[in-house]
């Protein structure tokens, strides 16, 4: 008991064990000095006065001092809240940097001498010698407690102060912080995790030096059992977490940030809410389309910004310098996407037609009217399969594709041909080049091949298939030609030598092509349009070994 021990001149005196936590009746203790030691200043007067009179003065002074300490009453603020936490098992977070307690330790003090100065301080002592663990939704003893940390005292920042100051309002220790850093240099109270502790409040009468710790210091200690807690690094019991959320206004980490809700509320209350850039861009384009030709784009943009509809349905209007000159133009909520799509397509086509390489194709007027671009677009399947769509694109993109004019050497238009089926096995039926022998042919009829002997400046608009073949396309071309024309070899006349150069295709073009080879040319054009100049050279080197050649 603190009554049986005198206080030393250091703060170690407050580390003495207090009353047992189980004794609910002994919630406060007092310590009064000896009568003779309580009035050291009166010792000389007592010696000079009669013996009976000096003893009476000392006894009266000691009784007054003892009565003052005993009359101090302390009440715990928010006691009902503390009881709720205590019933669930109060937990207090401890961190390296220090964490404040919640509920905060606040008391109401009465019965002090208004003119006497007091010092209020708190220490936190172990409640028992056990270590705890939270298992099966309850706290259980896990073993023996770790050695206690050196005790620290938290002195209230207002100390020392008169009794009138302390009794004027609540005394709050909300700035007290708990830490598990054993080397903490900030004066926080050091605790061990998963241990049970009991806070204690000490009221000390200040001496003539406004300090405490002298041998004749009077003090009292108040303990509230409902303020005991278990120190943890994170909350273990969900009930404690819920109580913290419901009662702690600063528990943002658990409640969830309401900043987004507040931001939305402020946004709705603003006069000019923010709208997305994509919506404004579409409205500007549509306003330019609806504007007259003599109206400038800036004027149209101003009309679009003059009035708009926000997402929540409320109509907002920008302040205009001359509202009578700018008509109100409300933009509809549902916009036709086809209008925007065809407008961009027409503008891109016009930009491509301005190129020099397209001027030769502008002589023939397009059969498609301008009103075609303002109709709703056909479905996706029709766009991919409709031949009219292909014929529409061909003259406008003539720089990329071969030609939409007359047919070449009896070959039909490229757009009219169906796309060839692409397959990895399309060359399996063709004999390889190594098995082909030129000497087996007696005579080979010659027919013009514009793709080989003319300048390769025009290329058909068909996908290349050179990468999918197992052999060079030139070899396959020659094999196919052999298969199709071998039946006509013996029907030709006298043979001729084949000393032909690449620069003499004019002599061959005078002969009309046979209908059978026209069919072969159509097949060749549909299957091997990715032939390069290297394949053409291979073809000429192979044909140079033929002895007899006829012009038909």
Swiss-Prot record:
Cellular compartments annotated: Nucleus
BP-aspect Gene Ontology terms: angiogenesis; embryonic hindlimb morphogenesis; embryonic limb morphogenesis; embryonic lung development; limb morphogenesis; lung development; morphogenesis of an epithelium; positive regulation of DNA-templated transcription
Keyword Nucleus (UniProt): yes
Recorded GO CC terms: nucleus
InterPro entries for this protein: p53-like_TF_DNA-bd_sf (IPR008967), T-box_DNA-bd (IPR046360), T-box_sf (IPR036960), TF_T-box (IPR001699), TF_T-box_CS (IPR018186)
Phosphoserine sites (modified residues): 514
Region feature Disordered, mapped onto this chain: 1-50
Pfam families: T-box (PF00907)
Keyword Transcription regulation appears in the UniProt entry: yes
Amino acid composition bias (Basic and acidic residues), ranges on this chain: 1-14
Stated role: Transcriptional regulator that has an essential role in the organogenesis of lungs, pelvis, and hindlimbs.
Protein name: T-box transcription factor TBX4
Organism: Mus musculus (Mouse)
């Amino acid at each position: 008991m603190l009554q049986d021990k005198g206080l030393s001149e250091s703060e170690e005196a407050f580390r003495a064990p207090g009353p047992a936590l189980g004794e609910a009746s002994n919630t406060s203790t007092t310590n009064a000095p000896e009568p003779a030691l309580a009035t050291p200043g009166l010792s000389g007067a007592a010696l000079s006065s009669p013996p009976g009179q000096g003893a009476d003065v000392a006894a009266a002074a000691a009784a007054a001092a003892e009565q003052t300490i005993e009359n101090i009453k302390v009440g715990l603020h928010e006691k009902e809240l503390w009881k709720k936490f205590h019933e669930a098992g109060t937990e207090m977070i401890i961190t390296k940097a220090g964490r404040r307690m919640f509920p905060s330790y606040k008391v109401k003090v009465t019965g002090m001498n208004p003119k006497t100065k007091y010092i209020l301080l708190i220490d936190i002592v172990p409640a028992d010698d056990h270590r705890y663990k939270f298992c099966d939704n309850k706290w259980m003893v896990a073993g023996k407690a770790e050695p206690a940390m050196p005790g620290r005292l938290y002195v209230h920042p207002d100390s020392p102060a008169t009794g009138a100051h302390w009794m004027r309002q609540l005394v709050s220790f909300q700035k007290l912080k708990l830490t598990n850093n054993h080397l903490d240099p900030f004066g926080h109270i050091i605790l061990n995790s998963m241990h049970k502790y009991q806070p204690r409040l000490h009221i000390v009468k200040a001496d003539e030096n406004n300090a405490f710790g002298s041998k004749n210091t009077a003090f009292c200690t108040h303990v509230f059992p409902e303020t005991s807690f278990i120190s943890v690094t994170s909350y273990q019991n969900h009930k404690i977490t819920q109580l913290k959320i419901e009662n702690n206004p600063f528990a943002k980490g658990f409640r969830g940030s309401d900043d987004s809700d507040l931001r939305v509320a402020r946004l709705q209350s603003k006069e000019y809410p923010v709208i997305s850039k994509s919506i404004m861009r579409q409205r500007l384009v549509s306003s330019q389309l609806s504007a007259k030709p003599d109206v400038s784009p800036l004027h149209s943009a101003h009309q679009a910004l003059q009035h708009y509809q926000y997402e929540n349905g409320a109509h907002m209007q920008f302040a205009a310098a001359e509202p009578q000159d700018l008509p109100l133009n409300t933009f509809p909520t549902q916009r036709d996407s086809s209008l925007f799509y065809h407008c961009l397509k027409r503008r891109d086509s016009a930009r491509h037609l301005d190129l020099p390489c397209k001027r030769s194709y502008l002589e023939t007027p397009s059969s498609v009217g301008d009103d075609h671009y303002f109709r709703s677009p056909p479905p996706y399947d029709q766009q991919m399969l409709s031949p009219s769509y292909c014929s529409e694109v061909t003259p406008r993109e003539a720089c990329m594709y071969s030609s939409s004019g007359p047919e070449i050497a009896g070959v039909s238009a490229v757009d009219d041909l169906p796309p060839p089926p692409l397959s990895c096995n399309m060359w399996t039926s063709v004999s390889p080049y190594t098995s082909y022998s030129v000497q087996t042919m007696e005579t080979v009829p010659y027919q013009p091949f514009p793709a080989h002997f003319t300048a390769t400046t025009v290329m058909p608009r068909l996908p290349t298939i050179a990468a999918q073949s197992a052999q060079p396309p030139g070899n396959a071309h020659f094999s196919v030609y052999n298969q199709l024309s071998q039946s006509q070899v013996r029907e030709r006349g006298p043979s001729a030598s084949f000393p032909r150069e690449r620069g003499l295709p004019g002599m061959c073009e005078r002969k009309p092509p046979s209908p059978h080879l026209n069919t072969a040319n159509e097949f060749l054009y549909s299957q091997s349009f990715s032939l390069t100049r290297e394949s053409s050279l291979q073809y000429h080197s192979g044909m140079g070994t033929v002895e007899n050649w006829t012009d038909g």
